């Protein structure tokens, strides 16, 4: 039996608490049933909002920005967006922005989705990331997905994850690259996994991570 728990504070339940819960549940479990407590897989939605407004109706742009930001934050903190199986509805989000003030005439919002992966350090493992929303291929030459930095066994440099679409533009391959400069990526390891753009799924072959960074 697999169990997930959404804590009030922080995204994950500490391992010590997981072990205590498993010990308690073991007293009530039926013979042959083993309880495994897994970390939740959060899907983060990041938005870049450009709202257009009539300045004669809202002379104070800073105040208008504050109202829009507060409404977005309230929506982000709502139970609707923080329950199991929640769905982000783009049209509803745009309506929330537009309805923030009668001065707003329209908005163009760019949406980026993100998952935070907790790798097993210093041990080889496969990884699967599922996003539930088709990936947009902006560049057929690759580098459509982005990751923060990480290190792997046998490579001293900080690496990043990149993608290369296949000819069908439905699937592709994953690779690791390092940055010699901001706009100068160098591929270090090719074909380290696969990506399905339509299904929004990525599968990494067995890899040994040795560290991660937030940049």
Which residue stretches match the model-derived regions?
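Extended Gly/Ser/Thr-rich low-complexity repeat segments
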Residues: 16, 143-145, 209-215
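Short amphipathic alpha-helix segments
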Residues: 18-28, 95-97, 172-180
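An aromatic-glycine-centered, glycine-rich loop/turn in mixed alpha/beta architecture
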Residues: 38, 62-155
């Amino acid at each position: 039996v697999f169990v997930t728990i959404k804590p009030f504070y922080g995204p994950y339940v500490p391992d010590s608490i997981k072990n205590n819960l498993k010990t308690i549940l073991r007293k009530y479990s039926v013979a042959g049933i083993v309880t495994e407590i897994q970390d939740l897989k959060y899907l983060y939605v990041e938005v870049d909002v450009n709202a257009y407004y009539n300045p004669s109706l809202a002379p104070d742009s800073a105040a208008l920005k504050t109202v829009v930001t507060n409404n977005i934050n309230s929506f982000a903190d709502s139970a609707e967006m923080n329950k199991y199986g929640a769905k982000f509805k783009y049209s509803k989000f745009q309506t929330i922005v537009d309805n923030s003030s009668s001065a707003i005439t329209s908005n163009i919002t760019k949406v980026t989705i993100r998952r935070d992966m907790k790798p097993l350090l210093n041990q080889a493992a496969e990884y699967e990331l599922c996003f539930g929303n088709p990936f947009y291929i902006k560049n057929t030459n690759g580098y459509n997905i982005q990751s923060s930095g990480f290190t792997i066994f046998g490579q001293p440099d900080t690496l990043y994850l990149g993608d290369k679409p296949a000819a069908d533009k439905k699937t592709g391959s994953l690779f690791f690259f390092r940055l010699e400069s901001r706009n100068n990526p160098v591929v270090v390891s090719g074909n380290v996994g696969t990506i399905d753009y339509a299904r929004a799924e990525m599968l990494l072959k067995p890899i040994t991570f040795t560290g991660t960074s937030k940049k």
